[in-house]
């Protein structure tokens, strides 16, 4: 399994970031070819402090090659282009092969 974890930075309007992600960006991501799993959530902390990121998404493919093909596709290009519409504060994209500890 090959995974992408996308961590979105806080911006001037976190509610707008979450709304845009829910209504526009997540549906674009769901169209990526070959995607096996796509989950996301709004970050929080157990003690109520401000979390490091506003939201985090996790996407999975069978292989790195499948992920590369997904981002090279029309759907992938649309998702990347959409980042300028809501993620101006930045997003960290971490790609890796999944290893299980269990």
What residue spans do the PLM features occupy?
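Macromolecular interaction modules
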Residues: 1-102
């Amino acid at each position: 399994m090959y995974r992408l974890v996308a961590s979105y930075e806080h911006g001037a309007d976190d509610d707008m970031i979450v709304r845009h992600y829910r209504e526009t960006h997540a549906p674009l991501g769901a169209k990526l070819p070959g995607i096996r799993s796509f989950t996301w959530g709004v970050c929080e902390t157990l003690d109520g402090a401000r979390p490091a990121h506003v939201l985090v998404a996790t996407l999975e493919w069978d292989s790195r090659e499948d992920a590369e093909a997904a981002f090279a596709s029309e759907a992938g290009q649309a998702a990347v282009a959409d980042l300028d519409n809501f993620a101006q504060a930045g997003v960290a994209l971490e790609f890796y092969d999944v290893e299980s500890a269990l």
